[in-house]
């Protein structure tokens, strides 16, 4: 297991595996409003996937793992998109700050993230160990 990190694994496979791990573990609580909320003003509908909250949490955990520290505002920019304005030119809209904040708070509650001294969140030692362990299991599956 030495030397295996999240960078060594395909992003989509890792996010799917980590989302399944988060759902299976049962530690992470989901808000009641996740089935009706839009993920940003640029969206017309709520997500179709019933497990989208776990997928977003896995993607945010991977995003913060690959960087030193990330704030909620930066995550809103990352998960934003262009708004459809008909015939007029499209413009970028940020993603929902509430969704990003609740996901980060959920990850912080289970010990994956911790607050940084300079603002924002960073990955904790326990979180890094969990993410590396899942990356190692994915590499083992690929080698078989």
UniProtKB/Swiss-Prot annotation:
Residues 83-102 are annotated as: Disordered. GO terms for cellular component: cytosol; cytosolic small ribosomal subunit; nucleolus; nucleus. PANTHER family: 40S RIBOSOMAL PROTEIN S19 (PTHR11710:SF0). The keyword Nucleotide-binding does not apply. The lineage of its organism: Eukaryota, Fungi, Dikarya, Ascomycota, Taphrinomycotina. Keywords: Cytoplasm, Nucleus, Ribonucleoprotein, Ribosomal protein. It comes from Schizosaccharomyces pombe (strain 972 / ATCC 24843). Transmembrane segments: none annotated. One of its GO terms (biological process) is ribosomal small subunit assembly. This is Small ribosomal subunit protein eS19A. It is found in: Cytoplasm; Nucleus; Nucleus, Nucleolus. Component of the small ribosomal subunit (SSU). Mature yeast ribosomes consist of a small (40S) and a large (60S) subunit. The 40S small subunit contains 1 molecule of ribosomal RNA (18S rRNA) and at least 33 different proteins. The large 60S subunit contains 3 rRNA molecules (25S, 5.8S and 5S rRNA) and at least 46 different proteins. There are 2 genes for eS19 in S.pombe. GO terms for molecular function: RNA binding; structural constituent of ribosome. Belongs to the eukaryotic ribosomal protein eS19 family. Its main location: cytoplasm. Component of the ribosome, a large ribonucleoprotein complex responsible for the synthesis of proteins in the cell. The small ribosomal subunit (SSU) binds messenger RNAs (mRNAs) and translates the encoded message by selecting cognate aminoacyl-transfer RNA (tRNA) molecules. The large subunit (LSU) contains the ribosomal catalytic site termed the peptidyl transferase center (PTC), which catalyzes the formation of peptide bonds, thereby polymerizing the amino acids delivered by tRNAs into a polypeptide chain. PROSITE patterns: RIBOSOMAL_S19E.
């Amino acid at each position: 297991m030495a030397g295996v990190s999240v960078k060594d694994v395909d992003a989509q496979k890792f996010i799917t595996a980590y989302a399944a791990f988060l759902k299976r573990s049962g530690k992470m609580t989901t808000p009641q409003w996740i089935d009706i909320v839009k993920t940003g003003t640029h969206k017309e509908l709520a997500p179709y996937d019933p497990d989208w909250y776990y997928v977003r949490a896995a993607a945010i955990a991977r995003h913060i793992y690959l960087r030193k520290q990330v704030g909620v505002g930066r995550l809103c920019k990352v998960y934003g998109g262009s708004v459809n304005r008909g015939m007029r030119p499209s413009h970028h809209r940020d993603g929902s700050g509430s969704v990003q904040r609740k996901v980060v708070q959920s990850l912080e509650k289970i010990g994956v993230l911790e607050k940084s001294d300079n603002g924002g969140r960073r990955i904790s030692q326990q979180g890094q160990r969990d993410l590396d362990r899942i990356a190692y299991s994915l590499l083992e599956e690929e080698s078989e």
